[in-house]
Swiss-Prot record:
NCBIfam families: pimt (TIGR00080), PRK00312.1 (NF001453). The active site is at 62. This is Protein-L-isoaspartate O-methyltransferase. It is an enzyme of class 2 (transferase). Pfam families: PCMT (PF01135). The gene is pcm. It comes from the Bacteria. Keywords: Cytoplasm, Methyltransferase, S-adenosyl-L-methionine, Transferase. It comes from Nitratidesulfovibrio vulgaris (strain DSM 19637 / Miyazaki F) (Desulfovibrio vulgaris).
Length: 215
C-alpha cells in the first residue's frame, strides 16, 4: 500500500504538475483516490502510468492526466452538483466526490454499473449516486446540474445535457465527427447563452445512446 501511495505522488508530480494541473483540490484528490482499485487486478502495476487501461466491455479508464484535466476544467467547488456520463469503473466519480462535489453518475453497461456501485460503497464515497441508463439522456429527475462531465465521445453535444445544465454552469465533453477522435469541448451556460470552446484533440471511447453513436 505504501508503494501505491508513492506511485500516486509520483504520478501527480511527473504527469500532472508538469502539464498545467494547478488546482489544489484536483491535485489533492488525485493523490488520495486509490486508482489501482479501479482497474483490473492484472493491470494494477500499471494503474499510475500515463495511459488509459481497459476495464472490460470495450471500455477504458482514462489516463490520469485526462481525469485531472477534466476535473480542473469544471472549476470544482465543494457542494456543487455534478452529472457524470459514463461511470466506467467509478474512478472519475471518486475523484469528484473526494473534492466534495455531489455526484450523479450514469452508466449504460450493467456489469460496470454494478461493479462501480459496489466499489464506491466499499470505499465509502457516500456523495455518489449511480444510475443504469442511457447517458445521452442525462438524469432529468435530479436536474439541473452545476457541472456536467462526459467521459465518452459523441458526434455532438446531446441536447438533453445542455437542457439539464444549470445557468450558470460548465460542461466538458469530447465531441467529434469520427469515432475515437474528438476535440475536448467546454460548454458554458451563462445568462441564457451557451458558448463552446475547444481544449484540443482527445481520444475517448464512443458515447453510445439516443443522442450519441448507435451501439
Amino acid at each position: 500500500m505504501l508503494d501505491m501511495k508513492r506511485n500516486r505522488e509520483r504520478m501527480v508530480k511527473q504527469q500532472l504538475e508538469t502539464r498545467g494541473i494547478t488546482d489544489p483540490a484536483v491535485l489533492a484528490a488525485m493523490r488520495s483516490v486509490p486508482r489501482h482499485l479501479f482497474v483490473q487486478e492484472a493491470l494494477r502495476a500499471q494503474a499510475y502510468e500515463d495511459h488509459p487501461l481497459p476495464i472490460g466491455y470495450g471500455q477504458t479508464i482514462s489516463q490520469p492526466f485526462i481525469v485531472a484535466l477534466m476535473s480542473q476544467i469544471i472549476e470544482p467547488q465543494p457542494g456543487l452538483r455534478v452529472l457524470e456520463i459514463g461511470t466506467g469503473s467509478g474512478y472519475q466519480a471518486a475523484v469528484l466526490a473526494e473534492m466534495g462535489l455531489d455526484v450523479y453518475t450514469v452508466e449504460r453497461i450493467r456489469e460496470l454499473h454494478a461493479a462501480a456501485r459496489d466499489l464506491l460503497r466499499t470505499l465509502k464515497y457516500r456523495k455518489v449516486r449511480l444510475k443504469l441508463d442511457d447517458g445521452t439522456l442525462g438524469w432529468p429527475e435530479a436536474a439541473p446540474y452545476d457541472r456536467i462531465l462526459v467521459t465518452a465521445g459523441g458526434p455532438e453535444v446531446p441536447l438533453p445535457l445542455i437542457e439539464q445544465l444549470a445557468d450558470p454552469g460548465i460542461m466538458v465533453i469530447p465531441v467529434g465527427a469520427s469515432k475515437r477522435m474528438q476535440e475536448l469541448v467546454v460548454v458554458r451556460k451563462q445568462g441564457g447563452r451557451v458558448v463552446r470552446e475547444s481544449k484540443g484533440g482527445v481520444a475517448f471511447v464512443d458515447l453510445v445512446g439516443t443522442h450519441g453513436w448507435r451501439g
